[in-house]
Swiss-Prot record:
Name the UniProt record assigns to this protein: Regulatory ATPase RavA
EC number: 3.6.1.-
Chaperone found in the keyword field: yes
Catalytic activity annotation: ATP + H2O = ADP + phosphate + H(+)
Function according to Swiss-Prot or TrEMBL: Component of the RavA-ViaA chaperone complex, which may act on the membrane to optimize the function of some of the respiratory chains. RavA functions as an ATPase.
Broadest EC class assigned to this enzyme: hydrolase
Chain's gene name: ravA
Compartments, record wording: Cytoplasm
Activity control, per UniProt: ATPase activity is stimulated by ViaA.
Source organism phylogeny: Bacteria, Pseudomonadati, Pseudomonadota, Gammaproteobacteria, Enterobacterales
Subunit field text: Homohexamer. Interacts with ViaA.
SUPFAM superfamilies reported for this sequence: P-loop containing nucleoside triphosphate hydrolases
UniProt-recorded Gene Ontology molecular function terms: ATP binding; ATP hydrolysis activity
Location (main, coarse): cytoplasm
Paired cysteines (S-S): none
Length: 498
């Protein structure tokens, strides 16, 4: 792949030119461009009058000398209107069944078919062959067709269990469009004087036939790394477990992988990256319900697994647990001993905290974990003022279990050694101890493990920062991934400060 970053820059500039004058259609243009560059088909779902046909018309200008064909289907449409009329002369003089295809679908690089589901069986069957094999049977001859992009559109989905499902399955990219939402964009659209049918693309950016053919071969050379395949397989397994998940054919998975390869290729990379998998959200859904489900599952994959976020959090949890164990091993030395007040004949014994315990919030470790309020508890956080009042006056005492959530009611007492003991429902007790002094710092074992974890986090964040330069991925998805990584980083740094 020659000068990959220059190619990525060129495709970005080409897309920007195609997007001019089209408001809130950047994502649709970019994915249609990606489909055209990889020879795939697109289905646009949405109400009339939202620029579906204009999107397809624009894509013609991405290529030098590209021919376009567009047609509005009705129940009465005939194959002649789509694939060309029969040659009366050939039929009369030579008895040959031959269509005159000039100006029709078989000789167009960019094809737009509106209200696609109204097409009859004769059109659908020929269209399936054209999409699958890029061939058209014209009489006795089988002709290769130059179609690079088929954009089909409708304001409805095909009926389930209908003859249309085979064609719908060939539409790899599926986009749900709506009218312009933003107020400023709506105003700009109303007042724009730009001729929507003018060519907005400079000749220097247009793609030649030679470039297109060469790129098709080079797209196939983009590798699929093992860790990316594992993410894809994880998504597939998760979808198989969900009762409401759409059926995704092996053919659709295979075609989707080529789309991911194209995304990597035109982003200047030699291998598919986890960020490319976000494109699957526009490939795997079938209807409105499955659209939301697919997006949710891919969101979980991207924010939890694609850059090892969940794995790093699991490692962090184990390190924190080990740190607490080490602290508990030292807890006998730091068991909290309260000070007894008053005489031995007082009606109720009163206590106070040692003078060296001054923090407004006290985190006390359990010498052995207890199950309190259905939670395995290793430490409890108390408000100093609440604990002092309980030591002085008795009554109810509450603390945050493991330092999280709301403060819970506790069974707390002072034993004969003047240590605080917390008990569970079976009255098993655990002595509360102060954590090691801050001056001691983190144990060497814990410090090293946290440093290694932080190093791994930096590597994953650097990988994401490098891979996120992808024209075809919406910015809001990238923002959520960045937030998930930053959250992991913040938790690691917090643990290092303990």
């Amino acid at each position: 792949m020659a000068h990959p970053h220059l190619l990525a820059e060129r495709i970005s500039r080409l897309s920007s030119s195609l997007e001019k004058g089209l408001y809130e259609r950047s994502h649709a243009i970019r994915l249609c461009l990606l489909a055209a560059l990889s020879g795939e088909s697109v289905f646009l779902l949405g109400p009339p009058g939202i620029a579906k046909s204009l999107i397809a018309r624009r894509l013609k200008f991405a290529f030098q000398n590209a021919r376009a064909f567009e047609y509005l289907m009705t129940r009465f449409s005939t194959p002649e209107e789509v694939f060309g009329p029969l040659s009366i002369q050939a039929l009369k003089d030579e008895g040959r069944y031959e269509r005159l295809t000039s100006g029709y679908l078989p000789e167009a690089e960019i094809v737009f078919l509106d209200e696609i589901w109204k097409a009859g069986p004769a059109i659908l069957n020929t269209l399936l062959t054209a999409i699958n094999e890029r061939q058209f049977r014209n009489g006795a001859l089988v002709e290769k067709i130059p179609m690079r992009l088929l954009v089909a559109a409708s304001n409805e989905l095909p009926e389930a269990d209908s003859s249309l499902e085979a064609l719908y399955d060939r539409m790899l990219i599926r986009l749900w469009l709506d009218k312009v939402q933003d107020k400023a964009n709506f105003r700009s659209m109303l007042t724009s004087q730009q001729d929507e049918n003018d060519n907005p693309v400079p000749a220097s950016l247009q793609i030649t036939d030679e470039e297109y053919e060469r790129w098709q071969k080079e797209i196939g050379e983009i590798t699929l790394p093992d860790h990316v395949f594992e993410l894809i397989f994880m998504l597939r397994q998760q979808l198989d477990k969900l009762p409401d998940a759409p059926y995704v054919s092996d053919r659709r998975w295979k075609k989707a992988i080529r789309l991911l390869q194209a995304s990597a290729f035109f982003s200047g990379r030699s291998a598919v990256a986890p960020v490319d998998l976000i494109l699957l959200k526009d490939c795997l859904w079938y209807d409105a319900q499955s659209l939301n489900l697919i997006q949710q599952q891919i969101d979980v994959l991207m924010t939890g697994h694609a850059w090892q976020q969940q794995g790093m959090l699991t490692r962090l949890g184990a390190i924190v647990q080990r740190h607490l164990q080490l602290q508990q091993q030292q807890s006998d030395k730091t068991a909290l001993t309260v000070i007894r007040l008053g005489g031995i004949f007082s009606r109720r014994q009163q206590y106070q905290l040692p003078v060296n315990v001054t923090a407004s919030t006290l985190t006390l470790l359990l010498q052995k974990p207890l199950k309190l309020h259905d939670m395995e508890v290793v430490h409890i956080s108390f408000e100093r003022s609440a604990l002092e009042q309980w030591l002085s006056k008795g009554g109810e005492i509450r603390g945050k279990l493991n330092g999280i959530g709301f403060a819970q009611k506790l069974n707390l007492e002072v034993d004969s050694a003047q240590h605080l003991v917390v008990r569970d429902v079976s009255l098993q007790g655990s002595t509360l101890a102060l954590p090691g002094s801050l001056a001691e710092g983190l144990p060497g074992e814990i410090k090293q493990q946290l440093e290694e974890l932080e190093s791994d986090w930096r590597k994953q964040h650097a990988l994401f920062s490098e891979q996120q330069k992808c024209l075809f991925i919406p910015g809001d998805w990238l923002g959520r991934i960045e937030a998930s990584l930053q959250d992991v980083g913040a938790q690691i740094r917090q643990a290092q400060q303990c």
